């Protein structure tokens, strides 16, 4: 199959590689679409955290073409969303209700393919969506029935699920409270929708781009702030009779935005 490989801070290379056999608990998926995440840009610029060449892409959508021994959550022919690395379910954090801190998250997964020169390849987040096929743990997939295109559904595996999860599972937003979201990209807009589902009374989005502010309002924000014309902290206080936000989300990845959120 063809796959996009990354090694250190070098440019991506697209090469022919050979998949290793599908093992117990694994699923082989023909890739329909992959989600391009800013994480891939960061990994490329920083030299990456995975030693040696590997297949990038940690979320996607596709069709199941083969299932390994013991797999029950999918059948051949199913259309599935592939999410990023699953939690192990066994470490200290998983046992104490914090699967987002799973100790296995930073551990390299098993080899999934072999390069023409014999080099064995791992997959980013045990997914490797920048390839014609993905060989992934069954716990990573979610069968889905939808008429939406793969370009939309692939975002569910990372950007959308990360934003919704932050709002619904991590922040524990109380109904009627005020939420501030810094940044209205895919993560921020997903947080907005999660905050709305959680019953937040006021959802304030800080975003410099007018079109994103408009989209945030359509998706559930009650107020928007342009940081180019208004000071975000003071503006949020003005909207809340001086109280400020009960919960703040930083969805930009910028140090200045992080300081503002705190």
Where do the language-model regions lie?
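Adenosine-nucleotide cofactor-binding segment
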Residues: 178-184, 194-260
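Short N-terminal strand-loop motif that marks the start
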Residues: 1-61, 128, 132-136
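N-terminal Rossmann-fold NAD(P) dinucleotide-binding loop
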Residues: 188-189
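Nucleotide donor/acceptor-binding cores
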Residues: 1, 78, 176-177, 201
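NAD(P)H dinucleotide-binding glycine-rich loop of Rossmann-like/cofactor-binding domains
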Residues: 30, 88-182
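Glycine-rich beta-strand-centered segment in the early N-terminal region that forms part
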Residues: 20-34, 47-95, 100, 145-148
């Amino acid at each position: 199959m063809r796959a996009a490989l990354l090694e250190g801070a070098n440019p991506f290379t697209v090469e022919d590689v050979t998949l290793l056999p599908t093992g117990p608990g694994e699923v082989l998926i023909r890739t329909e679409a992959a989600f391009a995440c800013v994480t891939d840009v960061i990994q490329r610029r920083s030299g990456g955290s995975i030693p040696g060449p590997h297949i990038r892409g940690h979320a996607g959508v596709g069709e199941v073409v083969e299932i390994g021994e013991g797999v029950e959550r999918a059948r051949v022919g199913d259309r599935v969303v592939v999410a990023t690395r699953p939690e192990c379910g066994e470490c200290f954090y998983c046992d104490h209700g914090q699967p987002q801190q799973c100790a296995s998250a930073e551990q390299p997964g098993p080899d999934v393919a072999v390069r023409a020169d014999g080099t064995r390849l791992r997959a980013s987040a045990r997914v490797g969506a920048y390839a014609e096929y993905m060989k992934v743990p069954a716990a990573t997939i979610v069968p889905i029935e939808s008429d939406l295109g793969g370009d939309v559904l692939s975002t569910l595996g990372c950007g959308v699920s990360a934003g919704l999860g932050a709002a619904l599972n991590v922040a524990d937003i109380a109904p009627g409270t005020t939420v501030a979201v810094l940044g209205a990209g895919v993560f921020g807009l997903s947080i907005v929708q999660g905050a709305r589902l959680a019953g937040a009374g006021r959802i304030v989005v800080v975003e410099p781009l007018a079109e994103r502010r408009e989209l945030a309002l359509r998706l559930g924000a009650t107020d928007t702030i342009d940081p180019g014309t208004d000071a975000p902290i003071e503006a949020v206080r003005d909207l809340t009779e001086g109280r400020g936000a009960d919960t703040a989300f930083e969805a930009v990845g910028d140090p200045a935005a992080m300081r503002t959120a705190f």
